[in-house]
């Protein structure tokens, strides 16, 4: 993980911890694909999975939008993947 990309990971983690009921179960893994895209894999506890996805995927979409907006400011491409 490159130190310059840590703010994106930290942003996603901070936003998610404010949404879930069990913030200690939130983890974000980060790696970079060959084309330079930063991939953030978000994992939450089983009880919080539905809360992070939201009705119709709205919460997940909002999280992705905020992180992508931050990535644009840093001239990065980012992909947020919510893993179960």
Regions inferred by a protein language model and the residue ranges of each:
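RNA-contacting regions in translation and RNA-metabolism proteins
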Residues: 1-49, 62, 66-84
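Glycine-centered tight-turn and secondary-structure capping sites
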Residues: 53-57
